[in-house]
Swiss-Prot record:
This is Maturase K. It is found in: Plastid, Chloroplast. Signal peptide: none annotated. It comes from Stewartia pseudocamellia (Japanese stewartia). Usually encoded in the trnK tRNA gene intron. Probably assists in splicing its own and other chloroplast group II introns.
Length: 508
């Protein structure tokens, strides 16, 4: 952040969150253009073509402001959807660049304020907490003691004006917010000319950064109220709530919330007194698990629906929240089927001349790979058919043999690495079989041969070295305990370096 601060010269404007001048700086869009900045190598690099020009982006912003003051709310007609004489290039490209530039500008005051709020506080800064797998040890420890879970589909049909209004108490620069509001309005109108069937929240990978930022920030608003109510109802304060930044908007919401619910406030706090309640949000979904009864979970469901509709203007329905009993239902969670199953065990008790067999059942958190959705993902990616039979990948036939093998091997290693937490490894073996045979069929198609003849000529060892399984990697990591490592591999392994989900593992 120091580098950002020096480069963007934020000292003069950060006190009042005056970010309007940054919108006109070309280096902002150069930073947005560079997708390699602070991104994982596992993410797909979607670059722009060489026809993009920062000067045209700056001209487009100036043109936007001119139209804004003239109150002309239709910058482009339907005939100008792809080419525009003013721009001379693809208009969609520059709208995407401006969206990413806005995302960089809007994130700056939040990052600075978060950093300043954490100074002097003893908060552990661990990169391991960013890992997706870091949530599963928590679930292993907590879910085995719980009974019910709410599977919540978070409402996403939020008007863009509400998202901009949420920023007003954070960024007090009215000019930048007015320009952002105007641009989002124009972008939605222009985007509907090209994709009229898409909703305002159906965005491609190139331009979703700003909208995801606004959406996540809006969701964090009501989550912060949950933390506030939880702390008010419990003598044990939540440590994580200290990371929420103090802001006027939050406390105004709290005051309004308490004022409306003056009579029912104590009853509402009763919801949060349950010491065995846990909340997790992920991928537009959230789960709320509790040790309570089904009646309590029903009350939670209707409370959440009314809370979203009345105080955050988000339309929702009770049907979007499902109540599941953990012992009878599996939870589709981050590429895993998670459930709580009973693990029976027998204990022999000896008392003098008599012995007794005592049956005992222990609840255990279990995670497996959903093989049917996984085969569906492989089928959509053209690695196999809908029945799971491997097929060739014709679009890769023009690559070199080493590139083809490396691509297939990398996909399998990523999937095997991500699903290392599965308690049953047989599903991974089937995925390996599909990818290996698909790779062999692709190579045979390229050389106009059969799979049998190709493997007989080059040997199956050619593919084996590229499809190094997680077990071999684990053995290489702990070479002195190879026999022990094989036993450990059969158990669940959670890695703390996974910050994204492979598209094939994401069945959402």
């Amino acid at each position: 952040m120091e580098e950002f601060k020096r480069y963007l010269e934020l000292d003069r404007s950060q006190q009042h969150d005056f970010v309007y001048p940054l919108i006109f700086q070309e280096y902002i869009y150069a930073l947005a253009h560079d997708h390699g900045l602070n991104r994982s190598i596992l993410l797909e690099n979607i670059g722009y073509d060489n026809k993009s020009s920062l000067l045209i982006v700056k001209r487009l912003i100036t043109h936007l402001i001119t139209q804004m003051y003239q109150q002309n709310h239709f910058l482009f007609s339907a005939n100008d959807s792809n080419q525009n004489p003013f721009l001379g290039h693809n208009t969609n490209l520059y709208f995407q660049m401006i969206l990413e530039g806005f995302a960089v500008v809007v994130e700056i005051p939040f990052s600075l304020r978060l950093r300043f709020s954490l100074e002097g506080k003893e908060i552990v800064k661990s990169q391991n907490l960013r890992s997706i797998h870091s949530i599963f040890p928590f679930l292993e420890d907590k879910f085995s003691h719980l009974n019910y879970v709410l599977d919540i589909l978070i409402p996403h049909s939020i008007h863009l004006e509400i998202l901009v209004q949420t920023l007003r108490y954070w960024v007090k620069d009215a000019s930048s917010l007015y320009l952002l509001r105007f641009f989002l309005h124009e972008y939605r109108n222009w985007n509907s000319l090209i994709t009229p069937k898409k909703s305002s929240f159906s965005f491609s990978k190139r331009n979703q950064r700003l909208f995801l930022f606004l959406y996540n920030f809006h969701i964090c608003e009501y989550e912060s109220i949950f933390v506030f109510l939880r702390n008010q109802s419990s003598h044990l304060r939540s440590i994580s709530s200290g990371t929420f930044l103090e802001r006027r908007y939050f406390y105004e919401k709290i005051e309004h919330f308490v004022e409306v619910f003056t009579k029912d406030f104590q009853a509402i706090l009763w919801f949060f007194k349950d010491p065995f309640i846990h909340y997790v949000r992920y991928q537009g979904k959230s789960i709320l698990a509790s040790k309570g009864t089904s009646l309590l979970m029903n009350k939670w469901r209707y409370y959440l629906v009314n809370f979203w509709q009345c105080y955050f203007y988000i339309w929702s329905q009770p049907g979007r929240i499902h109540i599941n009993q953990l012992s009878k239902h599996s939870l589709d969670f981050l590429g895993y089927l998670s459930s709580v199953r009973l693990n029976p065990s027998m204990v022999r008790s000896q008392m003098l001349e008599n012995s007794f067999l005592i049956g005992n059942a222990i609840k255990k958190f279990d995670t497996i790979v959903p093989i049917i959705p996984m085969i569906g993902s492989l089928s959509k990616a053209k690695f196999c058919n809908v029945l799971g039979h491997p097929i060739s990948k014709p679009v890769w036939a023009d690559l070199s043999d080493s590139d083809i093998i490396d691509r297939f091997g990398r996909i399998y290693r990523n999937l095997s690495h991500y699903h290392s937490g599965s308690s049953k490894k047989t599903s991974l073996y089937r995925i390996k079989y599909i990818l290996r045979l698909s790779c062999a069929r692709t190579l045979a198609r390229k050389h106009k041969s059969t799979v049998r003849a190709f493997l007989k000529r080059l040997g199956s060892e050619l593919l084996e070295e590229f499809f190094t399984g997680e077990e071999q990697v684990f053995s290489l990591t702990f070479p002195k305990a190879s026999s022990t490592s094989r036993g450990l591999y059969r158990r669940r392994i959670w890695y703390l370096d996974i910050i994204c989900i492979n598209d094939l593992a994401n069945h959402e």
